[in-house]
Amino acid sequence: MRNQDKRAAHKDSEPSTEVNHTASSYQGRQQETGMNLRGIDGNEPTEGSNLLNNNEKMQGTPAEPNHLQRRRQIHACPPRGLLARVITNVTMVILLWAVVWSVTGSECLPGGNLFGIIMLFYCAIIGGKLFGLIKLPTLPPLPPLLGMLLAGFLIRNVPVISDNIQIKHKWSSALRSIALSVILVRAGLGLDSNALKKLKGVCVRLSLGPCLIEACTSAVLAYFLMGLPWQWGFMLGFVLGAVSPAVVVPSMLLLQEGGYGVEKGIPTLLMAAGSFDDILAITGFNTCLGMAFSTGSTVFNVLKGVLEVIIGVVTGLVLGFFIQYFPSSDQDNLVWKRAFLVLGLSVLAVFSSTYFGFPGSGGLCTLVTAFLAGRGWASTKTDVEKVIAVAWDIFQPLLFGLIGAEVLITALRPETIGLCVATLGIAVLIRILVTYLMVCFAGFNIKEKIFISFAWLPKATVQAAIGSVALDTARSHGEKQLEGYGMDVLTVAFLSIIITAPVGSLLIGLLGPRLLQKAEQNKDEEDQGETSIQV
């Protein structure tokens, strides 16, 4: 019995030893903490000594003004803050160029093709950032695309810079075609069939009427004033007929946040109708493009244009239904795979349609494919749109920079510029009047009709995307006369962006708060804010 008791006592002592070891370590830490809490002389701190120590610390580290802190941060070693960010960004830019140079050699040196593309890309980004910094009170910010466009324009027309930054036409055309594919995918995914059903008549009228009338007006003016053939006149008309979502949508969102026109759904109407307006313009342009470069009788050209539309729609239906189900929803990285497929198929459609002699079918195929894919994806459509938006952030500076770089001042005749401005001005006035008529009998008052008419003015994105397509196609055919027609179309597109984008943005910002009714909820919030300020 005694042996059993000893064994039991021994077993009980084992865990107690562990507990004692833990307790001793805890006590050790407590002692260390206590030693740390003691003063230098080893005495325990009292309330008076704590106050004394705090005063000594405050006297030892006086508070510095903000400007001294900023200077200390700037002159710190190693650098921090803004200086550190600048050094990091410059290093990344130089590293990108150095990596490309190590692979391509002379192509990435001044005068080389890749050097020109990289420099144009950087300059366009800087130009867009600078324009984005221009902010006027109570007005929407100026669209950064203007800075990108002007950056490309300056690169081409400043002698010293243009000698060292040169881009081959083939590369420029290919990059613009890829950017066009990205725009078409975004337009197709952004189509909202439910919004069209809700707004019905007024949305359809606003999408079709101004675009078609402006296209016809521009075609007549281009034929009689500029001497363009009818097919080229209608191409120019559909280039001008599209409204710019890059200008209209941000401005509408600002008004919507302020509660202007929300009760009658004016911001929603303009954003929804803008997508259909752009698709109509792009489809009409592609159809006229195919007819303009067809050889044969007029009847044959018309039939070929209809055939291109049919080919584009049918191919888009097939591809759209395919990527609705592949990749399947149980796969990993589903969003990235879907974004890659829709972008890859769109780029392939645009390039292959030109290769097979049906240039008008590629854009329509892309629109139908993206629209059907978006309807099938429903739950992940928004995530795919975010990935496509990243691709657009990359190709937007290239697109607008390359468009600006295509315009050479010395190659333009003064009378050509005058005729282009006259054609643009008359077409825009007709568009404003037609837009006013299209929104009649839709429940809007006179002020709201005037606002919608001027809000339907800005042009930018679609003009940059398709404005140079005719010129690129003419260059591929090697006909100087057709290249001249293409240059006229591009010049009008360039002028339309430079003139209407900033003017339209400013008009929306100025007229919106003055002509649109404000929602009651926003009025109550403002009244409460004013009352609290008075109190």
Swiss-Prot record:
Reactions this protein catalyses: Li(+)(out) + H(+)(in) = Li(+)(in) + H(+)(out); Li(+)(in) + Na(+)(out) = Li(+)(out) + Na(+)(in); Na(+)(in) + H(+)(out) = Na(+)(out) + H(+)(in)
Membrane topology recorded in Swiss-Prot or TrEMBL: Multi-pass membrane protein
Regulation: Allosterically inhibited by the N-terminal domain. Inhibited by phloretin.
GO biological process, one term: sodium ion homeostasis
Transmembrane segments: 86-103, 113-132, 144-160, 171-188, 200-226, 233-241, 270-289, 300-323, 339-356, 361-372, 390-410, 417-439, 461-472, 486-508
Region of interest (Disordered), ranges: 1-70
Domain of life of the organism encoding this protein: Eukaryota
Record's function text: Electroneutral Na(+) Li(+)/H(+) antiporter that extrudes Na(+) or Li(+) in exchange for external protons across the membrane. Uses the proton gradient/membrane potential to extrude sodium. Contributes to the regulation of intracellular pH and sodium homeostasis. Also able to mediate Na(+)/Li(+) antiporter activity in kidney. May play a physiological role in renal tubular function and blood pressure homeostasis. Plays an important role for insulin secretion and clathrin-mediated endocytosis in beta-cells. Involved in sperm motility and fertility.
Note: The subcellular localization of SLC9B2 remains controversial. Was initially thought to partially localize to mitochondria. However SLC9B2 does not seem to contain a mitochondrial targeting sequence. It was later established that its localizes predominantly in plasma membrane or intracellularly to endosomes and lysosomes. In another recent study, endogenous SLC9B2 in the distal tubular cell line mpkDCT4 is detected in recycling endosomes but absent in plasma membrane.
Protein name, UniProt field: Sodium/hydrogen exchanger 9B2
